[in-house]
Curated annotation (Swiss-Prot):
This is Alpha/beta-tubulin-N-acetyltransferase 9. Keywords: Acyltransferase, Transferase. N-acetyltransferase that mediates the acetylation of the N-terminal residues of alpha- and beta-tubulin. Belongs to the acetyltransferase family. GNAT subfamily. The gene is Nat9.
């Protein structure tokens, strides 16, 4: 989504940054896990397909995606590469054509050692606050596998209520209507959040040959963040996610 192309959200436990091609290799390693693919209802993709997917999400105006970083590690000095701070991702999907104020939320803490420490809760609250204040959302929905009890409990703690269950898809649907009291509660829970500009850093080479990259259905980005320069091999896919 172009709206958050230069936006980072800094919380106490997590930092949310736009999903760029710098993050793709580690994300690809995560999704080799059969457990994660099952919990997120995802298909296994090749590295090339992951880059193409990231590029397409850069342009899609109905997808707001952030990578979740460990705030403590990210704030260390000297600052480590973002890839080494990655712990998961969080998304808002604005795909209901009849109701543009509804956002479907997904959160994944991919690193097992970071689970059950409140990172998923804070990441969800940060993106919900962003959705309410920047995207005009008044309703949130989460679809979760029936066996994923930790995620169900987390969203219930965020005031979501179960509204449907599908035995066919083995999932439950939870929803939160953002009334004025709920909006106030969300903003209170995220009063510590800082919104900062996410500036393009010096491009780093991706781990693929030029011939491989030319076969991708995504124009190669220039180091300045503009699309289309096939002579540049960078890890920054226009920072349009």
């Amino acid at each position: 989504m172009k709206l958050n192309q230069n936006t980072m959200l800094v919380g106490k436990k997590v930092v949310l940054v736009p999903y760029t091609s710098e993050h793709v290799p580690r994300y690809h390693e995560w999704m080799k896990s059969e457990e994660l693919r099952h919990l997120t209802a995802s298909e296994q993709l090749t590295l090339q397909q992951e880059y193409e997917m990231q590029c397409s999400w850069c342009e899609d105006e109905d997808k707001c995606t952030f990578i979740v970083l460990d705030a403590e590690k990210w704030q260390a000095q000297p600052r480590p590469p973002e890839e080494s701070c990655m712990v998961g991702d969080v998304n808002l999907f604005l795909t209901d054509l009849e109701d543009p104020t509804l956002g479907e939320i997904e959160v994944m803490i991919a690193e097992p050692s970071y689970r059950r420490q409140g990172l998923g809760t804070e990441a969800s609250l940060l993106i919900m606050s962003y959705g309410v204040t920047k995207l005009g959302l008044t309703k949130f929905e989460a679809k979760i596998g029936q066996e994923n009890e930790p995620s169900i409990r987390m969203f219930q703690k965020l005031h979501f209520k179960q509204v449907a269950m599908s035995n066919v898809f083995q999932e439950v649907t939870l929803r939160l209507a953002v009334s004025e009291p709920e909006r106030k509660w969300i903003l209170e829970q995220t009063s510590h959040m800082e919104e900062r500009p996410y500036r393009t850093r010096k491009a780093e080479p991706v781990t693929a040959t030029l011939s491989e990259q030319k076969s991708w259905n995504c124009p190669l980005p220039r180091p300045d963040g503009c699309m289309g320069d096939t002579s540049a091999v960078s890890s920054v896919c226009a920072r349009l996610s």
